[in-house]
Swiss-Prot record:
Its cofactor is Mg(2+). This is DNA primase DnaG. It is an enzyme of class 2 (transferase). Mg(2+) 1 binds at residues 174, 218. It holds the Pfam family Toprim. GO terms for molecular function: DNA-directed RNA polymerase activity; metal ion binding; poly(A) binding. One of its GO terms (cellular component) is exosome (RNase complex). Transmembrane segments: none annotated. Its EC number is 2.7.7.101. Forms a ternary complex with MCM helicase and DNA. Component of the archaeal exosome complex.
Amino acid sequence: MKYLIRARLEVDGRVEKHDVIGAIFGQTESLLGSDFSLEELQNKDKLGRIHVELKYQGTKTIGSISVPSNLSRVETAIIAAMLETIDKIGPYPAKITIEEIRDLRLERLEKIKQRARELLRLMKEKEPDIREIIREVLQEEQAKAQVAKLVEYGPERLPAGPGVEKADTIIVVEGRSDVNTLLRYGYTNVIALGGAREKVPETIKRLAEQKKVILFVDGDRGGELILKNVLPQMKVDYVARAPEGREVESLTGREIAQALSQMKPAEIVARELGIEAAEKPAEEAVKREEEAAAEAKPPAPAVQEKAAKPPEEKPPTVKFTIPKAVLEAAKELRGTLEAIVYDKEWRELDRLKVRELYDYISKSEPGRIYAVVFDGIITQRLLDIASEKGVGIIIGNRIGNKITHKPTNVKFLTFSDLF
């Protein structure tokens, strides 16, 4: 707002705030035509909310009126003069007197000047110190020296990080340069194929039988060729790709983290490329099916010693059907970092960014949202607010590692459980 109109109010009787507001709108309506209708001006954000403060002195009412204005200086003066024409509030005579019209821009400019002076003093206080610069450079060099060193793993002497043996999940990349890049940013569970070779090294195949595998390739034609070569030969759980036209070795730490957060199940990537992925061990497939089924069922209630139920009384399985249109929408969400919220009839309520999802749910009325489908990570924080707001189903890209409590009233699944 540019200006603030401040006025003094005197009424020969006791009135309430709503009486004053009603008189302002009622007695100025059509006084100067539609261009100066207070209601229209507020709808267009030309006038702000009218604030009224009142106090009583005997049978009289005394107070102040504040009207923020985004109009021009002349138009603001006309509005102020129009307020002074109000001579009655409720059944009582009244008088409104304009005390001042403050230019809020001047106040902001004064704050800017004051803050600029403070910042200038701050800049002078922090003159560069050559000794401090030398110390920081030495610290940076020492930090670089502490980066994990590349090792040669297995009989094929494959370039790898020192954590590839102990890690539960490994990242498979193309070559030595890719390994060095990931090591630089703290990823020690990385191993290279040893270049664009036709046959996948046996060492990596053996690791894949014991660990989860993320295949991380370049975002170009070469990366696609590696996918077509590797996926049919060995078990791969997820596929991550560098941004389009970029190579893994050229990525920054943030770009690597983003690419890994957007990884897709290998089965989906194989279908997109029109190839057949290597089959996973039977026991792992069964485990995934059991986990997916478990997410669609409520956990059994705790058993109490004094009121134990007969073993044949098992909690019923809660079944729900996800419409085909919702499944198609979920597929299209991949890579968008967006979310869709639905009501109980699976009607779309809203579409928003994933970063806005938590606040959106927290501000919603309990029971309004039935299901959430989003291209992001299902976290404990999200499950807690969903449980509080009565959200029944959450479908995300993947589940976070720190889920310590599963709310009984929220079912959550991942994209890989559905397609």
